[in-house]
Amino acid sequence: MPVGVPKVPFRAPGDEDATWVDLYNRLYRERLLFLAQDINHEIANQLMGLMVYLSAEDSNKDIFSFINCPGGSVIPGVGLFDMMQAIVPDVHTICMGVAASMGSFILIGGEMPKRIALPHARIMIHQPASSYYDGSAADFHNESKHVTMLRDYITRCYIERTDQPGEVIQRDLNRDVFMSATEAQAYGIVDVVAEG
């Protein structure tokens, strides 16, 4: 039997009585965001909307993004990364569990030196993939050019945000590279490993 999303009490400023809201809505009010699934358009849009709202509400308060993400779609992931760079508040990224594929790309998007991994977190990087395309050769060629542009952008971001040489990033993105939290810190994906 599924538990569902727990409800917690929340009292808005000026209210005398608390109301019951789902856990995530309560945490969002505290500027705590969660990416705990594959990245798709829906979750990316929700998180980007929350970031814009929280930035407009108070651009001086940091936002904390907790990540337990096995990957997901490239386009929404790049959009989420770009939004993290565009808003005024610093975004802390905290890897809890796994940040793989697009999840690791979101992890590096946090404000330096505010990228954190919990002690037993696992991080995996690799290149963006394109799904099998069932269309004309011209359409496939256009899609492959677009995938190449995205791959180049993601590679540049990893180079800039990890300080690894370009050859290292290009080599490592050509395969699945798994890292522990301490290995990810040495690589430059995170700045801090939280103490257990």
UniProtKB/Swiss-Prot annotation:
Subunit (UniProt): Component of the chloroplastic Clp protease core complex.
Top enzyme class: hydrolase
A UniProt-annotated Pfam family: CLP_protease
Family the entry assigns: Belongs to the peptidase S14 family.
A GO MF label: ATP-dependent peptidase activity
One GO BP annotation of this record: protein quality control for misfolded or incompletely synthesized proteins
PROSITE patterns: CLP_PROTEASE_HIS, CLP_PROTEASE_SER
Keywords: Chloroplast, Hydrolase, Plastid, Protease, Serine protease
UniProt name for this protein: ATP-dependent Clp protease proteolytic subunit
